[in-house]
Curated annotation (Swiss-Prot):
Compartment(s) of residence: Mitochondrion inner membrane
Organism expressing this protein natively: Drosophila persimilis
Any GO BP: aerobic respiration
GO molecular function, one term: NADH dehydrogenase (ubiquinone) activity
Function text: Core subunit of the mitochondrial membrane respiratory chain NADH dehydrogenase (Complex I) that is believed to belong to the minimal assembly required for catalysis. Complex I functions in the transfer of electrons from NADH to the respiratory chain. The immediate electron acceptor for the enzyme is believed to be ubiquinone.
Record family assignment: Belongs to the complex I subunit 1 family.
Pfam family, one: NADHdh
The protein's name: NADH-ubiquinone oxidoreductase chain 1
Keywords attached to this entry: Electron transport, Membrane, Mitochondrion, Mitochondrion inner membrane, NAD, Respiratory chain, Translocase, Transmembrane, Transmembrane helix, Transport, Ubiquinone
GO CC annotation terms, alphabetical: mitochondrial inner membrane
Topology versus the membrane: Multi-pass membrane protein
Enzyme class, spelled out: translocase
Organism superkingdom: Eukaryota
Gene: mt:ND1
Membrane spanning stretches: 6-26, 80-100, 107-127, 153-173, 177-197, 229-249, 253-273, 292-312
Length: 315
């Protein structure tokens, strides 16, 4: 019986990973199409019908190119960091709330925080092991940025833990049957979305990949497979952050088709931000993290703690 359950959960995990990777492929196509229409041009439209097979052609091109590595780089860490980056981006999907018994995490929120904290190391090691000044600067920027915004991210998640009384993601579904958290906590949703942009190194917070300053940033020395893996990890984390936003703020009804429409819309917002917003200034980025978001999330945390104490004192 145990073996049967184990095999079923293994098949479920494999299906989840395959679906995430296919979603990543089509998210890149969506991004290129949307950016094309924002810049008043058509996106990829030559390959197949309306350019739909384009991501698969890109994948074939990237993985069949010659794999080069810099002579002065640290060979092992240079190769392992993109693989570990993609592994973490796929591993964090385990805390997606399932109704069926695939994984039922009582500490899903904590698991998510652990995985995002580990994601810092991959960028740092990728930047350092390339042995290039540009890559190192990009890596250091990414580390400073991610650590700064992770504090506010953890505090906001902790506020929700106090509110719903559990780290389990399924509790978000029970508490949002009648009203979404987005409606009653709109400022918090905006801050969470901004932090998600910073955590995934997206515009306007793409300092790790500042082309105008750092010649592509921490992944400047990566070609073919290594670059593709970093790219896939970034887009998998964008999809995950979109999914998490839907779970926390937009009603966590995973079996409803509308949940995936909402997820697609939030992913579209990430792309929309890239097409419309210019890059932020680095000092303003740090001021935003430590002076605005930290005080905001701390105030909300104290408010929720006070609210629960008040509630229990009257019960």
């Amino acid at each position: 019986m145990f073996y049967m359950e184990f095999i079923l959960s293994l098949i479920g995990s494999l299906l989840l990973i395959i679906c995430v990777l296919v979603s990543v492929a089509f998210l890149t196509l969506l991004e290129r199409k949307v950016l094309g229409y924002i810049q008043i041009r058509k996106g990829p439209n030559k390959v197949g019908l309306m350019g739909i097979p384009q991501p698969f052609c890109d994948a074939i091109k990237l993985f069949t190119k010659e794999q080069t590595y810099p002579l002065l780089s640290n060979y092992l860490s240079y190769y392992i960091s993109p693989i570990f980056s993609l592994f973490l981006s796929l591993f964090v999907w385990m805390c997606m709330p399932f109704f069926v018994k695939l994984y039922s995490f009582n500490l899903g929120g904590l698991f998510f925080l652990c995985c995002t904290s580990l994601g810092v190391y991959t960028v740092m090691i990728a930047g350092w092991s390339s042995n290039s000044n540009y890559a190192l600067l990009g890596g250091l920027r990414a580390v400073a940025q991610t650590i700064s915004y992770e504090v506010s991210l953890a505090l906001i998640l902790l506020s929700f833990v106090f509110l719903i009384g559990s780290y389990n993601m399924m509790y978000f579904f029970y508490y949002q049957i009648y009203i979404w958290f987005l409606i009653i906590l709109f400022p918090m949703a905006l801050v969470w979305l901004t932090i998600s942009l910073a955590e995934t190194n997206r515009t306007p917070f793409d300092f790790a990949e500042g082309e105008s300053e750092l010649v592509s940033g921490f992944n400047v020395e990566y070609s073919s497979g290594g670059f593709a893996l970093i790219f896939m990890a970034e887009y998998a984390s964008i999809l995950f952050m979109s999914m998490l936003f839907c779970v926390i703020f937009l009603g966590c009804d995973v079996f409803n088709l509308l949940f995936y429409v909402k997820l697609t819309f939030i992913s579209f917002v990430f792309i929309w931000a890239r097409g419309t917003l210019p890059r932020f200034r680095y000092d303003k980025l740090m001021y935003l993290a430590w002076k605005c978001f930290l005080s905001f999330s701390l105030n909300y945390l104290l408010f929720f703690i006070g609210f629960k104490i008040l509630l229990f004192s009257f019960l």
